[in-house]
Swiss-Prot record:
Enzyme's top EC category: transferase
Catalytic reactions on record: alpha-ribazole + adenosylcob(III)inamide-GDP = adenosylcob(III)alamin + GMP + H(+); alpha-ribazole 5'-phosphate + adenosylcob(III)inamide-GDP = adenosylcob(III)alamin 5'-phosphate + GMP + H(+)
One of the GO biological process terms: cobalamin biosynthetic process
PANTHER family per the UniProt record, alphabetical: ADENOSYLCOBINAMIDE-GDP RIBAZOLETRANSFERASE
Needed cofactors: Mg(2+)
Pfam families given in the database record: CobS
CC terms in the record's Gene Ontology section: plasma membrane
Protein name: Adenosylcobinamide-GDP ribazoletransferase
Pathway stated in the Swiss-Prot or TrEMBL entry: Cofactor biosynthesis; adenosylcobalamin biosynthesis; adenosylcobalamin from cob(II)yrinate a,c-diamide: step 7/7
Chain's role: Joins adenosylcobinamide-GDP and alpha-ribazole to generate adenosylcobalamin (Ado-cobalamin). Also synthesizes adenosylcobalamin 5'-phosphate from adenosylcobinamide-GDP and alpha-ribazole 5'-phosphate.
Membrane topology listed for this record: Multi-pass membrane protein
Organism name: Rhizobium leguminosarum bv. trifolii (strain WSM2304)
Subcellular location: Cell inner membrane
């Protein structure tokens, strides 16, 4: 793939995964399918993670409490992404928690209203990520600790490619099915890119042990969640893609904080 093509795919991936505006000229010849675009998801994660990382750096530089700074940074990240992945996590939690069968779970996941399981999942997601990010900030210099945000953003979006490629669509008429399924090459490129980005950001800043811990935690989380969804729904949906990102981000941040 040419560098220009990859840059265009990254910009399109940013537009799909966030509310960051991109030039309309990038979409004139684009068919809207995401099968190839997933290879750029990790690089899109870097772009998406830049704004919350900058906010965290500013707050830590002003000697703000690390937990408060982490919560504000995560809130800004939600604004940047339009809560795309958080919505998927909440819908998946409601569907899996409230559905007694595959069909009932999928029906619940279509409901835009949030239920008890979804609310609990969102609260826990924010709480655990904020606590982990605050722990990283307490044990690292401000300029070092903020690198965790784009690193984990890239890693968790690479995990989306794995989940998406390894499972068939749960619904033939679903959004995920209409967007196309990544091929093996796109998935492998996304995983390799995510690993490279994480290595370049985490190893120099935090060391080898935190790097290995975050990679292992995210990988195990992606494998376990994909196997769980295969058993429960026999396929992926747009919501389970978002849930994969959230779960892997939580796992990577917790592992990174623990390994420091």
């Amino acid at each position: 793939m040419k560098i220009k093509d990859h840059a265009v795919d990254t910009a399109r991936a940013v537009a799909f995964l966030s509310r960051i505006p991109m030039p309309q000229s990038l979409f004139k010849t684009y068919d809207g399918r995401l099968g190839r675009l997933v290879r750029a998801f990790p690089f899109a994660g870097i772009v998406i993670g830049f704004v919350p990382a900058l906010a965290l750096l500013l707050l830590l530089g002003l000697r703000a409490d690390p937990l408060m700074a982490a919560l504000i940074a995560l809130s800004i990240q939600v604004v940047v992404t339009g809560a795309l992945h958080e919505d998927g996590l909440a819908d998946t939690a409601d569907g899996i928690g409230g559905g007694k069968s595959r069909e009932q779970s999928l029906e619940i996941m279509k409901d835009s209203r949030i239920g008890t399981y979804g609310a609990i999942a969102l609260i826990l997601s924010f709480a655990i990520r904020a606590a982990a990010l605050a722990a990283i900030a307490r044990h690292s210099l401000p300029l070092t600790s903020v690198l965790a945000i784009p690193a984990v953003a890239a890693l968790s979006r690479g995990a989306i490619a794995w989940h998406w490629q390894r499972l068939p669509p749960a619904k033939a008429d679903g959004v995920a099915a209409s967007n196309g399924q990544p091929d093996e090459g796109a998935m492998q490129f996304a995983l390799a890119s995510a690993g490279l980005v994480v290595a370049l950001l985490i190893w120099p800043a935090f060391g080898l042990r935190p790097l290995v811990a975050s990679l292992l935690a995210s990988g195990i989380a992606a494998l376990a969640f994909t196997a769980f969804i295969r058993r429960k729904l026999a396929g992926h949906t747009g919501d389970t893609l978002g849930a994969t990102q959230q779960i892997c981000e939580i796992a990577a941040l917790c592992a990174l904080a623990t390994a420091l």
